């Protein structure tokens, strides 16, 4: 019995050792291997600040006027190339038990045109590239298969785009839907079937496709609006546009704050919309390319009527109107004679009250006195703007044309 007891004691010792080793080994393992992984409570509990940070959409940063100027482009030099025509094929008909088949090479497809198309949703030439290549036509095939012609490539341009070539105006795209073929596609080549004749029953001649037309065009944008606000720098044109429309041009107390034209829409009853353009400030000698120069004077050409904005707080404000009309007349004959209204701004300033009576005496016409900052007398401007538009619309309908709609 002694050996049996000794064996059982040793066996018990071995089992105890194995048990201690198993417990120590399991304890040393990572919890992730033993238990299913659970999300950390920190990931599930989000504070109010963190929740707002994740839920709120990132707001769009307001661009300064200098940065906006990069997005508004009113001039582009464009190289347009029409698509090349496809080559004709030279092959013969092949059929069992027919040794001498006739020619069956098809013609190549024509190259695609490059066309300028006016799109009302486009407001600038910034999306126009400096080079365009039309789609080429496919080559002809056997069994009289003609190649597919290249698709037409459309270039979207804004309303009021002027197309020039070699200093000469070749197209004036002033209406929505207007199109102009900027470059013609090349003609497709002829297959050998085209050269089949009585004295040549097995022609092998085929011609390559013609290259597309290449042209260098200069695109100029002239902003199309019903009314154009004209004035000297810091006269309050941008503030006035912000007051009567939803446009948000930059406003500051220094001259030449506005570096590009802005167009605001004034809404009236009956879904009538009048477009008002804020033209950058004009100085004396602007027609000689001083200041911002004549680069922005051309935007006034398409305006149907004008609003001369005068800074009433400046000494002798009537001279501003005379100088503005002179600059417009020097730039283009008859531009200053368009229907217009005189808007005297900054009536809220003390020095403006003293100049009001003198301004009316010198001009001898109705003057709309208001303050774009405080909103004083803006209703009179809106009513007069409607009168100018009605006169313009009546004149257009009398000549059989539809008024410009935005």
Swiss-Prot record:
Subcellular location, record wording: Mitochondrion; Mitochondrion inner membrane
Binding site for Mg(2+): 238, 258
Spans annotated as Localized in the mitochondria: 15-406
Record's keyword annotation contains Membrane: yes
Any single Pfam family the record assigns to this protein: MMR_HSR1
Binding site for GTP: 231-238, 256-260, 278-281, 345-348, 371-373
GO-annotated molecular function: GTP binding; GTPase activity; magnesium ion binding
Membrane topology: Peripheral membrane protein
Positions of the UniProt region annotated as Not localized in the mitochondria: 30-406
Recorded family membership: Belongs to the TRAFAC class OBG-HflX-like GTPase superfamily. OBG GTPase family.
Name assigned to this protein: Mitochondrial ribosome-associated GTPase 2
Lineage, top ranks: Eukaryota, Metazoa, Chordata, Craniata, Vertebrata
